[in-house]
C-alpha cells in the first residue's frame, strides 16, 4: 500500500474544510446551498460563488490523484457541482414565463428572482417585495456554466434546456441599458428600492456573453443543435458602456469594490489594461481598510449607526456612515486571485498574510472567514476622528460561504494544486493581452450589369449580386428576422430572440444555413425605413464610422467581411456615372487604408477562407414545421417592418431560389423578401403649370389648419414649411428662433370634420362642392396636374389627415381601382429622395411617421453613457426629459408629442439623436463636460449659427437648417459640439443639379477659438482672487480697436464682436461646464446652506446624501441650472460658481447661509458698467439685455484678463461674502 503524498494530505485538509464550511450545507434533493445557517434561502449569486471551491478541489484531486479513491473523490465533488448548477437551472426554468416577458419589457417585476427556497426551488418572496432584478447574478451563472462545461462537466442534458439557456442569453444581452439592483441588491445606495445602471452587472453580462458564444453545451458529446449563439454587437455595447463608466460603479456610487469581480477573476471583462489598473487603484486607495475593503463609500449595511428597524435610509442619513463603513475580507480573496492571474507574487503574499490576520479559528482549528468587520458602537466617535484606528469586531455570517469558497480556491491556486488555465479554460484571463491589427475585408458589388459597366470604366472590376452565387446576398433586416427563430421552443412557450436591429459586427460574417452560404449588407444601407441612406455623402460617412468600428471592436477569429453594394441611388442624377463621393471612397478602399482601418478589397469567394463563419443550425430541415407555422400570426405584427424589406439588387438569384425551390426555408425567405418594386401611380409633375394653392395659402397654412381640426390648436409660427423652388417671398415657415410658448386654448369639439372642410375650403380656396365643403374629387384631379412635388405632398397631406392613410385615390378614373394615400406618399418619398429634396423628404417622413431603425438604440447609447436627453423646443412643459431607455414606439410617440405635432421638428429630433449617438460612440471626449443634451435647444443653436453666418432672418435660417442634407446636418452638429470656431457659407451647386435644397459649406476658421483654460480664466485668476486689492481699475481696450498682430493679420474689434457671446450661448445651450465644476459646487455647499440660482435653491443637505463624484449629484446641480432659459446667462452663472469655488478653497469654515449667485453676477455687471461709464462709453455700449438686465457687452467680454468677466466676478464674489473672509488685507492660503 502506497503512503499518502504530502500533496494528497494537503488536499485532504482542504476537502475537510470544504465539507465543513460548504458541502455540509448542500441540500440533498435540489443541490442548492443556503446563504448561511441563519438564512435558509438560496441566492443565485452566492450559490455560484460558493461552489467554485468544490469545482476547483475536484479538478485538483483529478490532477493530483495518488490512488483510485482520489478519483472517486474528484467524481463526487464534480457531481456536487453539477447538482447545484442543475438545481439553479431548474429554479429559473420554473420561471420561464418571466424570461419570456422580460425580453420585451425589461421591467423589475418581470425578472427572474434573486433567491429561491433551498429545499423546493420555489420562490420565497413576491415580485415586488425584493430587488430581484440582478443581471450580474444570472450572468455569473451563465459565465461559470460555460467555464465548467468547457472543463468537461456535463450540466445541460437536453435541447429544451439548451433553448432555455439561449433565452437567458437574450435576457442578459440588454444589460447595458437595464437599470437593476446590482450585486448588493440595493440599487441606488440610498437603499430606497431605486434601480440604477451598475458597472458590475454590465461587466459580468459582457463576460458571460463572450464566454458562452459558440459554446456547445453538450461538450464533447454535442452537435450543432446544442451550440449557443450570441450577437457580437450586443457584447460590444456592454464593452462600450462599461469602459465609459469605470472606475465609477453607478450613478450613485463613484467606486465599488464589487468591480474587482469585473476587472479580474471571474469576469476579466475589461480589455484596457490601464483602465484595469486605475479601477483597482481607486478601490484600494478609497475603500481598503485593516480588515478588508468597504463595498462603497457611505455603505450603511451593519453599521453601528444603521437603524435596523427601517429597510430604507433617509437621504441625509448617509453622511453618518462615512468612515465607519463595514469592511469585508472577501475583497482580499479577489485580490489574491487577481495577483495569481497577474503573476504578481508580492500581491498574493501580501493579501494572504492579511487574510491570516482576520481569519477566525473554529472547531478543530477550521479556518473561517466572517462576512464583515464592524466598528464597536462605543468607539464610533473615535473612528470618525481617526479612520482605520479602531479595532473592529467580526459580525454577519460565519462562515460566509461565498468568501470561504474564494479563499479556498485562492489557496489551491497559490499552492500549485491548480493552474490558472484549469479554472479558466475559456482563457478569459488574456482579455488585456495584445491583439493584432484587424484587416477589414470589403467586397464591393454592383446592383446591375449597367452599374458594373460604369465601375469598369473607372478601372474597378466588381461582380454583380447575381454573379456571386452560390453565395447569397441579403439585407440586414432579413438577418434580424432570421434570428427571431433562435431559441424558439414551443414546449417552454419561448418565442426566441425579439426582433432587433443587427449591427455591423453581426453582418460582417458569413452564415451557413442549410448548406448554403449567406452574407448580409450593413443596416446603414437600408433606404426604405429612414432617409439617411438616401444621402450618398452620409453613406460614405457611415461607412467610415463602421469600418473604424470593425477595426477596433472585432474580436472573433478570422477577418470581418463587409459587403457594400453600389445601387442605382449612388449614381449621379442622370444615371450615367457613379456619384463622385462614392467613387473616391471606392478608390481609397482600393488603396488599402480608410478611416484609420486596414482594408482589403476583393471578391466574396476569395474572402470565404479568411472570414468568420457562423452555422445557424436552428434553421435546419427538422425545424421546418415550426418555421412557417407561426408566420400568419407574425405577419401582421411585423408587416410594417418587412413590407419594404428587400432592396432588389437586380437579378441576384435570390428571387430565383426563393420562388422556385420547395425548401421550406426558401419559402420562409420568400415571405420576408416580398418584392418592394413599386408600380408608379403618381402622374409626372406638370412643370410650368400654376400652383394648386394661392400664394398666400401654402403648406404653412395647411399644416396649421390640419392641426386645428385635430384639436391641437398649434400656433402657426411653430410649424415648418419645406423649401420649394418656387417659394414666394411672403411664404411663411418655421422660425426656430422665435417660438411662442405652448398655448392651452379650447380644443375644437363637435363636428370637427365638417367645420374643417368648410373652413379649409373657404380659407385656402380649395375646390368646393355644392354644399360648400371640400370637393375631394376635384382635389384628386388637381393632384394629377401639380407643377411640383411640394404641391403633391400638400394635397396628399390634406387627404391623409382628412380621409386617412387607407383612403383610396382613383387616379386612373372611376372604376379603375384606387391607390391608398399611404402608398402614394411612399412613392412620393422615393421621388423626393431621388431629387435630394431634403426638406420635402423630412416633411413626408413626418407624415408617414417614419422612425429611425436604430432610434431606441441611439437613445440607449446616450443614456447609458450617463447623459440625459430632452426633446422638444424649450421651455418646459413642452421640453420633455428622457432619463431611462424607452421602447421604440413609446420613444417615437414622446418625440412627436414634445414637438407639438410639428412633424418636421419631430423627424429632425430623431435624426440629431442618431448623430449624437454616433459621436458618443466614436468621440466620447466631445461630451466630457455635458450631462444633459437638450436636442430642441441644439436645433435652435444650429439655426442661430446659420442665421449669423449667412446673415439671414430666423425664418430663412430655419428653412435652411431643415433643408440641409443629412451629411451637412451631422457636420454642423459636430462643429457645435466640438467648440471650435467655424464658418458657414453658401456654395454653388453643379449646373446639372436639379436639387433645390441650399448648398452650404461648413469650414473651420482655424485656431482662433480660446482653449478651455482661456474660457474659464481659472489659472490666471487663481492667484488674483486670493488678494483683495482695493486699488482703482483702469479699463483696457475693450472698446478700442485691436492693434496689428505679429503674424496673423489685423483683426479689428468689430470683427471680433459677438465672439464670446456666441461661445457662451453655445456652451450654455449644450450644457457644457468646466472640468471639475460639480466638485466645486459640492465644496461650496459644504461651507454654506445652499446656492440660489435664478430663484431655485440647491440645498447643502445634498452633500450629506451624495459624494462629490456621484453622477446623481451632477444631475441635481443640472436640474437647478436648467431652469435658466437663456443659455448665455446660464453660462455666466456657471462662471460665477467657479469663482465661488475658488473662494471656498480659502481656509474658512463658512462663507454664508444661502448664497444668491444671481446677485453676485449682477454686482459684477454693475462694476463693469461703472468702469465703462468712467471711460465715457456711449449708450450703445451700455445697452442691457431686457430679460436679464446684464449688459450685452459684458456677455461678450472674454473671461480672462484684468478686465475680463472673471475679474469682475471675483471682485463681486469677494464683496458679497467679505464678512466671512479673514480680516487681513490679503487672503493667503
From Swiss-Prot:
Gene3D superfamilies: 1.50.10.10. Pathway: Glycan biosynthesis; glycogen metabolism. Disulfide bonds: none annotated. Residues 825-855, 1052-1092 are annotated as: Calmodulin-binding. Residues 625-648, 1024-1050 are annotated as: Disordered. Polymer of 16 chains, four each of alpha, beta, gamma, and delta. Alpha and beta are regulatory chains, gamma is the catalytic chain, and delta is calmodulin. This is Phosphorylase b kinase regulatory subunit alpha, liver isoform. It comes from Takifugu rubripes (Japanese pufferfish). The gene is phka2.
Amino acid at each position: 500500500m502506497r503512503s499518502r503524498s504530502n500533496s494528497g494530505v494537503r488536499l485532504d485538509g482542504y476537502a475537510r474544510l470544504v465539507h465543513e464550511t460548504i458541502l455540509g450545507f448542500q441540500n440533498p434533493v435540489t443541490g442548492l446551498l443556503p446563504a448561511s445557517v441563519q438564512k435558509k434561502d438560496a441566492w443565485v449569486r452566492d450559490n455560484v460563488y460558493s461552489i467554485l471551491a468544490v469545482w476547483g478541489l475536484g479538478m485538483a484531486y483529478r490532477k493530483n490523484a495518488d490512488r483510485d479513491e482520489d478519483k472517486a473523490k474528484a467524481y463526487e465533488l464534480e457531481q456536487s457541482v453539477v447538482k447545484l448548477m442543475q438545481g439553479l437551472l431548474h429554479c429559473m426554468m420554473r420561471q420561464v414565463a418571466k424570461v419570456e416577458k422580460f425580453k420585451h419589457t425589461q421591467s423589475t417585476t418581470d425578472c427572474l428572482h434573486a433567491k429561491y427556497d433551498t429545499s423546493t426551488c420555489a420562490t420565497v418572496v413576491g415580485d415586488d417585495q425584493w430587488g430581484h432584478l440582478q443581471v450580474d447574478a444570472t450572468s455569473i451563472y451563465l459565465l461559470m456554466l460555460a467555464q465548467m462545461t468547457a472543463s468537461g462537466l456535463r450540466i445541460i442534458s437536453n435541447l429544451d434546456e439548451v433553448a432555455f439557456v439561449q433565452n437567458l442569453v437574450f435576457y442578459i444581452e440588454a444589460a447595458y441599458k437595464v437599470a437593476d439592483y446590482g450585486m448588493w441588491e440595493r440599487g441606488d445606495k440610498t437603499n430606497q428600492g431605486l434601480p440604477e445602471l451598475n458597472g458590475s452587472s454590465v461587466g459580468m453580462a459582457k463576460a458571460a456573453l463572450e464566454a458562452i458564444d459558440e459554446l456547445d453545451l453538450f461538450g464533447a458529446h454535442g452537435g450543432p443543435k446544442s451550440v449557443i449563439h450570441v450577437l457580437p454587437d450586443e457584447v460590444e455595447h456592454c464593452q462600450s458602456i462599461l469602459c465609459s463608466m469605470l472606475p465609477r460603479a453607478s450613478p450613485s456610487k463613484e467606486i465599488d469594490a464589487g468591480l474587482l469581480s469585473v476587472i479580474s477573476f471571474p469576469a476579466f471583462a475589461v480589455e484596457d489594461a490601464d483602465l484595469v489598473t486605475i479601477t483597482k487603484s481607486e478601490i484600494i486607495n478609497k475603500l481598503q481598510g485593516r480588515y478588508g475593503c468597504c463595498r462603497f463609500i457611505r455603505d450603511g449595511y451593519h453599521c453601528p449607526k444603521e437603524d435596523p428597524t427601517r429597510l430604507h435610509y433617509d437621504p441625509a442619513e448617509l453622511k453618518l456612515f462615512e468612515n465607519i463603513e463595514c469592511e469585508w475580507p472577501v475583497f482580499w480573496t479577489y485580490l489574491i486571485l487577481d495577483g495569481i492571474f497577474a503573476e504578481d507574487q508580492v500581491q498574493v503574499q501580501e493579501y494572504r498574510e492579511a487574510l491570516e490576520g482576520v481569519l477566525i479559528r473554529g472547531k478543530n482549528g477550521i479556518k473561517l472567514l466572517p462576512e464583515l468587520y464592524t466598528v464597536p458602537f462605543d468607539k464610533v466617535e473615535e473612528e470618525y476622528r481617526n479612520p482605520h484606528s479602531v479595532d473592529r469586531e467580526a459580525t454577519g455570517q460565519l462562515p460566509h460561504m461565498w468568501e470561504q469558497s474564494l479563499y479556498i480556491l485562492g489557496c489551491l491556486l497559490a499552492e500549485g494544486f491548480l493552474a490558472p488555465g484549469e479554472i479558466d479554460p475559456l482563457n478569459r484571463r488574456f482579455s488585456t493581452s495584445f491583439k493584432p491589427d484587424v484587416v477589414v475585408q470589403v467586397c464591393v458589388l454592383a446592383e446591375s450589369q449597367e452599374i458594373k459597366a460604369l465601375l469598369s470604366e473607372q478601372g474597378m472590376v466588381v461582380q454583380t449580386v447575381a454573379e456571386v452565387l452560390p453565395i447569397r446576398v441579403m439585407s440586414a433586416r432579413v438577418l434580424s428576422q432570421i434570428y427571431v427563430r433562435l431559441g424558439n421552443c414551443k414546449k417552454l412557450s419561448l418565442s426566441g430572440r425579439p426582433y432587433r436591429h443587427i449591427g455591423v459586427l453581426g453582418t460582417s460574417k458569413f452564415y451557413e444555413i442549410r448548406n448554403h452560404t449567406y452574407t448580409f449588407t450593413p443596416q446603414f444601407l437600408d433606404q426604405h425605413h429612414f432617409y439617411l441612406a438616401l444621402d450618398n455623402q452620409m453613406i460614405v460617412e457611415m461607412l467610415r464610422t463602421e469600418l473604424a468600428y470593425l477595426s477596433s471592436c472585432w474580436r472573433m477569429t478570422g477577418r470581418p467581411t463587409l459587403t457594400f453594394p453600389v445601387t442605382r441611388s449612388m449614381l449621379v442624377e442622370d444615371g450615367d456615372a457613379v456619384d463622385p463621393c462614392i467613387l473616391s471612397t471606392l478608390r481609397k478602399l482600393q488603396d488599402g487604408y480608410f478611416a484609420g482601418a486596414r482594408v482589403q478589397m476583393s471578391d466574396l469567394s476569395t474572402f470565404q477562407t479568411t472570414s468568420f463563419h457562423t452555422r445557424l443550425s436552428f434553421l435546419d430541415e427538422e425545424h421546418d414545421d415550426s418555421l412557417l407555422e407561426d408566420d400568419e400570426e407574425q405577419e401582421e405584427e411585423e408587416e410594417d417592418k418587412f413590407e419594404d424589406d428587400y432592396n432588389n439588387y437586380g437579378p441576384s438569384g435570390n428571387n430565383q431560389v426563393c420562388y422556385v425551390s420547395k425548401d421550406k426555408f426558401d419559402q420562409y425567405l420568400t415571405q420576408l423578401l416580398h418584392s418592394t418594386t413599386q408600380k408608379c401611380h403618381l402622374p409626372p409633375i406638370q412643370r410650368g403649370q400654376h400652383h394648386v394653392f394661392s400664394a398666400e395659402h401654402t403648406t404653412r397654412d395647411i399644416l396649421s389648419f390640419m392641426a386645428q381640426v385635430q384639436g391641437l390648436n398649434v400656433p402657426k409660427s411653430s410649424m415648418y414649411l419645406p423649401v420649394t423652388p418656387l417659394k414666394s417671398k411672403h411664404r411663411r415657415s418655421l422660425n426656430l428662433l422665435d417660438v411662442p410658448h405652448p398655448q392651452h386654448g379650447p380644443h375644437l369639439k363637435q363636428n370637427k370634420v365638417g367645420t374643417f372642410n368648410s373652413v379649409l375650403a373657404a380659407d385656402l380656396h380649395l375646390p368646393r362642392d355644392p354644399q360648400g365643403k371640400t370637393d375631394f374629387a376635384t382635389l384628386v384631379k388637381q393632384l394629377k396636374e401639380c407643377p411640383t412635388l411640394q404641391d403633391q405632398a400638400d394635397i396628399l397631406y390634406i387627404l391623409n389627415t382628412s380621409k386617412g392613410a387607407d383612403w383610396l385615390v382613383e387616379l386612373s378614373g372611376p372604376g379603375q381601382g384606387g391607390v391608398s394615400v399611404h402608398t402614394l406618399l411612399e412613392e412620393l418619398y422615393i421621388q423626393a429622395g431621388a431629387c435630394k429634396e431634403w426638406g420635402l423628404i423630412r416633411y413626408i417622413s413626418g407624415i408617414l411617421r417614419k422612425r429611425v431603425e436604430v432610434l431606441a438604440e441611439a437613445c440607449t447609447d446616450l443614456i447609458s453613457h450617463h447623459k440625459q436627453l430632452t426633446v422638444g423646443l424649450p421651455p418646459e412643459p413642452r421640453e420633455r426629459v428622457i432619463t431611462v431607455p424607452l421602447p421604440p414606439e413609446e420613444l417615437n410617440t414622446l418625440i412627436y408629442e414634445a414637438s407639438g405635432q410639428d412633424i418636421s421638428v419631430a423627424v429632425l429630433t430623431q435624426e440629431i439623436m442618431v448623430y449624437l449617438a454616433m459621436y458618443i460612440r466614436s468621440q466620447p471626449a466631445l461630451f466630457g463636460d455635458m450631462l444633459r443634451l437638450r436636442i430642441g435647444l441644439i436645433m435652435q443653436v444650429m439655426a442661430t449659427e446659420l442665421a449669423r453666418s449667412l446673415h439671414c432672418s430666423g425664418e430663412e435660417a430655419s428653412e435652411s437648417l431643415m433643408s440641409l442634407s443629412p451629411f451637412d446636418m451631422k457636420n454642423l452638429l459636430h462643429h457645435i459640439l466640438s467648440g471650435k470656431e467655424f464658418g458657414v457659407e453658401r456654395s454653388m451647386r453643379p449646373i446639372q443639379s436639379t436639387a433645390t435644397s441650399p448648398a452650404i459649406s461648413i469650414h473651420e476658421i482655424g485656431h482662433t477659438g480660446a482653449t478651455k483654460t482661456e474660457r474659464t480664466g481659472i489659472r490666471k485668476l487663481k492667484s488674483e482672487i486670493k488678494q483683495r486689492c482695493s486699488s482703482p481699475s483702469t479699463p483696457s481696450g475693450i472698446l478700442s480697436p485691436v492693434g496689428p498682430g505679429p503674424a496673423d493679420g489685423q483683426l479689428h474689434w468689430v470683427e471680433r464682436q459677438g465672439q464670446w457671446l456666441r461661445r457662451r450661448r453655445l456652451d450654455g445651450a449644450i450644457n457644457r461646464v468646466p472640468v471639475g465644476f460639480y466638485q466645486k459646487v459640492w465644496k461650496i455647499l459644504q461651507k454654506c446652506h445652499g446656492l440660489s440660482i435664478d430663484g431655485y435653491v440647491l440645498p447643502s443637505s445634498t452633500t450629506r446624501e451624495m459624494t462629490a463624484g456621484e453622477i446623481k449629484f451632477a444631475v441635481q446641480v443640472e436640474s437647478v441650472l436648467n431652469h435658466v432659459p437663456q443659455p448665455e446667462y446660464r453660462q455666466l452663472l456657471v462662471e460665477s460658481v467657479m469663482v465661488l469655488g475658488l473662494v471656498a478653497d480659502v481656509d474658512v469654515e463658512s462663507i454664508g447661509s444661502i448664497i444668491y449667485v444671481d446677485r453676485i453676477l449682477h454686482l459684477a455687471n454693475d462694476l463693469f458698467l461703472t468702469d465703462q461709464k468712467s471711460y465715457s462709453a456711449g449708450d450703445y455700449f451700455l445697452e442691457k439685455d431686457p430679460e436679464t438686465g446684464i449688459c450685452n457687452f459684458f456677455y461678450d467680454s472674454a473671461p480672462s484678463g484684468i478686465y475680463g468677466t472673471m475679474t469682475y466676478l471675483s471682485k463681486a464674489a469677494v464683496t458679497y461674502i467679505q464678512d466671512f473672509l479673514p480680516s487681513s488685507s490679503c487672503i493667503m492660503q
